[in-house]
Amino acid sequence: MHQPYDVTIIGGGPVGLFTAFYSGMRQMKTKVIESLPQLGGQLATLYPEKYIYDIAGFPKVKAQDLVDRLLEQANEFDPTYVLGETVLAYERLDDGLIRLVTNKGEHYTKTVILTAGNGSFAARPLGVADAERFEGSNLHYFVNEMDRFKDRQVVLLGGGDSAVDWSLMLEPIAKSVTLVHRRDKFRAHEHTVELLHNSSVNVMTPYTLESVTGEDSIETLTFKHAETDEVIVVGADDVVCNFGFVSSLGPLKEWEVEFERNSIRVNSKMETAIPGVFACGDIATYDGRVKLIATGFGEAPIAVNQAKLLVDPSARHPQHSTSLFEKVKNH
């Protein structure tokens, strides 16, 4: 059997990366297992060009830039990254170690920290006839490269933060931006909705999508007013569907932890119902928790410090980062 790790972090999103950094500061041998072929979670996969506004110290930061900073930070302590593997099951061994079984092999660890966010995810489809045949051309479910929309007529559908944020970000780049929502009110943050209404974005509410037409790509979209049945046909060079994502925790649902909807109940120490298994970030829940990256950043050190005590009961209480970081780097 290979030498076990002190902690194995399941999930390589922003909270998982910060957890890896902090466990490195606590001089723990650290492994990160990520089911996607790249680190960064939804930020890197779905929203790399999107700005984030609620990270302390950054008035705004592009998602990919935040991921790059987190990777640079975590890599100070050379954690082991395992990409493209999905954890299927765990087993407590007689010697107290935890054996993690993935779709490609086995991993041995003393503790586990779950930072899998909302789990695996898939975009909710556009939901009209023949739409799927345009998914390889000009129907998009997320925006990876802003420049591809330069000087083009872009129609976005949705009423949440992503739809509003992308509309505002594409406004100075695209030839025109139209945002269509089936309700009168948007679910996005109040401030960004105010920015939307003060922008040049053409806002259409409450309209539902009836059909799309086109040969090799979507050329027109037909909308019906939800109250008056008025029909409007809108031309488009690109269509961005922001109806959200369906997420699943997959095999984690079989673990002997307490679930609350799609999250795992933890206590104030980030402990789950399984000894030695902790959770932080959006996969964790407790009374009053707010689903923000910033919240997960605060939970990560709690989980790591508790895991450290299990690995080494004689470990001292963590010091401030300045003295701790210098001590570890000079070790």
From Swiss-Prot:
It catalyses: 2 reduced [2Fe-2S]-[ferredoxin] + NADP(+) + H(+) = 2 oxidized [2Fe-2S]-[ferredoxin] + NADPH. Belongs to the ferredoxin--NADP reductase type 2 family. It comes from the Bacteria. This is Ferredoxin--NADP reductase 1. The keyword Flavoprotein applies. GO terms for molecular function: ferredoxin-NADP+ reductase activity; flavin adenine dinucleotide binding; NADP binding. Its EC number is 1.18.1.2. Homodimer. It comes from Exiguobacterium sibiricum (strain DSM 17290 / CCUG 55495 / CIP 109462 / JCM 13490 / 255-15). It is an enzyme of class 1 (oxidoreductase). FAD binds at residues 34, 42, 47, 87, 121, 282, 322. Its cofactor is FAD. Keywords: FAD, Flavoprotein, NADP, Oxidoreductase. Binds 1 FAD per subunit.
